[in-house]
Amino acid sequence: MIKKIGVLTSGGDAPGMNAAIRSVIRAALAKGIEVYGIHDGYLGLHRDRIEKLERRSVSDIINRGGTMLGSARFPAFKEESVRREAIANLNKHGIEALVVIGGDGSYMGAKKLTEMGYPCIGLPGTIDNDIAGTDFTIGFDTALNVVMEAIDRLRDTSTSHKRISVVEVMGRHCGDLAMAAAVAGGAEFVIVPEKGFKKEDLLANIDEGIASGKRHAIITICEHVTDVNALANLIELHTGLETRATILGHIQRGGSPTARDRILASRMGAYAVDLLIEGQGGRCIGLQRNELVHHDIIDCIENMKRPFNEELYNLTKILF
């Protein structure tokens, strides 16, 4: 049976990563497996920033956002020679497998290690909810609640001043956060990269809302679709109503994780340990229909595509 495993977090931090780290460590220790934490992601793996962790190492972290292990961008990990040096560090400590918590860039690193014969398990840790093979990623629910609270606050002031608010949220090229926030926050309009938008159609919809007696409007938009300040200016010129853009930015990544994210991270962390005990390497874990599943990590990255949530998108159109 496997005797030593490592765990690292990589890429952008997400609330619930600490809960996942805690789960991996305590589930492994409960089954007699030693656990080593790698600080600062793949950079720390290459620089040998590796330490043995115990149960007390993860006391009082389940409620904390961010990641106790730290994270870092490390483009040089794409180079095979760099990865070989990283594997040499793992072998030096006797670490037989690695649990990687992060987004698609982190998965790519785990895929590369897997292709070199080193077993890895990927856990989806990103607020963007853009990982194939899972309905939800660790951190998405917490970020959604942060965005929803921001929309609630903006609605208060927008109603008071008969103002239109354009709210930019994270998500990179995935509109899940913008759509879920639109439904949960009661936004009038949502703009996502999967669907794009025509400015004339948006303006016509806003005109329709004003004609029906609406005193304000909330528009949620995924980052990178368009310049939100320019869009706000366009809307204000067209309608004559004060329009302001709010870019929520990195506030969406921080804060104490929700109960849903803590439970999801805990389930996935323990499941990763079970898979490694079974001799399963090169896998990534997901949650589908509330059941834990695992996929081949190479197949997940190369062939699986995350489906667009048409139901949620259509709901935003009905409920505005």
Swiss-Prot record:
Regulation: Allosterically activated by ADP and other diphosphonucleosides, and allosterically inhibited by phosphoenolpyruvate.
Transmembrane segments: none
Binding site for substrate: 126-128, 163, 170-172, 223, 244, 250-253
Binding site for Mg(2+): 104
Coiled coil segments of this chain: none
Quaternary structure (record): Homotetramer.
NCBIfam families reported in the protein's UniProt record: PFKA_ATP, PRK03202.1
Protein name: ATP-dependent 6-phosphofructokinase
Species per Swiss-Prot/TrEMBL record: Tolumonas auensis (strain DSM 9187 / NBRC 110442 / TA 4)
